Design a protein with these regions (language model features):
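A structural boundary/capping signal
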Residues: 1-150
Length: 150
């Protein structure tokens, strides 16, 4: 429903701008980077009681379903396509990254939010908005200090 009927999809043309990361703007435009689309999906799915977890792959954020013998991954940036563990490992290898098992595990809420903020730091820096960049960097530091896994 989110990707089909509602039309949410990856923001390929505006990947490096804050509007593809800020959830209010992603909801309005229905375009976002992987982590933003995953956050919207996670919020809706959890509200419905679905057992989904954030998965912080390097270069591509996904949603994981860790029920049963093998996890299943949802690639929100690719229209909600389901991926197997092997497919996700291949995606990592195709991007010159190690297929490390740790990459395939859920991440904490703090880690997810810190990653969102790091993206915004980079995006605001690229636009020359040092004030906003510094603001989101303070959020990163606060989140990293209080991560429940730290």
């Amino acid at each position: 429903v989110i990707f089909g009927e509602e039309g949410y999809r990856g923001a390929q043309e505006s990947f490096a701008v804050p509007s593809s990361s800020l959830l209010s703007q992603v909801i309005h435009s229905r375009r976002g980077i992987p982590i933003s689309l995953c956050l919207i999906f996670l919020l809706v799915a959890r509200r419905l009681g679905l057992p989904v977890e954030p998965v912080g792959l390097p270069g591509r954020f996904m949603v994981g379903i860790f029920r049963g013998r093998e996890p299943l991954y949802l690639d929100c940036y690719e229209g909600g396509a389901f991926r197997t563990r092997a497919e996700v490992q291949l995606l990592l290898l195709d991007n010159q990254l190690p297929a490390d098992e740790a990459f395939l595990l859920p991440v904490t809420t703090h880690q997810t939010l810190a990653r969102c903020c790091r993206n915004l730091v980079s995006q605001f820096e690229a636009q020359g908005d040092d004030r906003s960049s510094r603001l989101f960097l303070t959020f990163v530091h606060a989140l990293e200090k209080t991560d429940e896994r730290a």
